[in-house]
């Protein structure tokens, strides 16, 4: 389309080409965009830590097999250590970002959530930071170290059955009684954007990352990270790392990507990665669908092996969920993806791989059991 627009000095009619219509915004832009994540970063800056990035040459050596050495290809790993975040895991970011957007009346009434792990402790700590009450619904079977953390941070614990309907019903009852605001663990815009600040920091710390590997469960963390990473460096590949569970049944994120639709009817995986048992939600799935390039599944043995490597080589303690990213990086699936996937395989001979170590809250008794000689 051409629009007329006045006359030139010579008297000839001057024309201006109409601007191209703007592309419609993605359905996820309203709750998971780079702009919103940058706003979240400014909001939580006085409260959350900028976590360090560590490297380990001995693990890099383990990543290169004989074929890689012949071809001259190398992989360098960069570990984003959310184990050093307040509360010992990444969840504090999303919890703090959520609380900081509440009204005065909402702050006075407090917050409520249901969680078996790090989100519960993170919300209790964020609430304590702002001096407001927190009500935490915890299903049976939650790790004792995480229960202890909730109590230390002043959270008021209510136990329930380990089913989603019972968790939600218990939360609803507390909301009715107290007027508290529900802060969901992952399927919530402020939580997604808070977790997305991990990706923002990571790309500032290592601007030329070729790939980022992130553990996935409900999808709050990887949705935020993918939105940030793809917004800054579109060619950077984002890979989800998901536990298969002891039953070796396909996990829901893997199946959802495979079928290109949200799969939410699979059984909860029986896995030592207790923080990765949730299913993706209606907000997180569209981001995973559009911005996550692949899903790599890992076994229980691979998770334990990754924990041992991190402990022995890096001298860091991570919980099973926190080691899932490295387990994926060390897997044969990742080697195949590296060799066969053109967008990632053609980047360079020297490939920079980011791995998010998402948490370090693990019972020492479990650690001793996992590391005991078989």
What spans do the regions from the language model cover?
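PLP-dependent amino-acid enzyme catalytic core
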Residues: 2-374
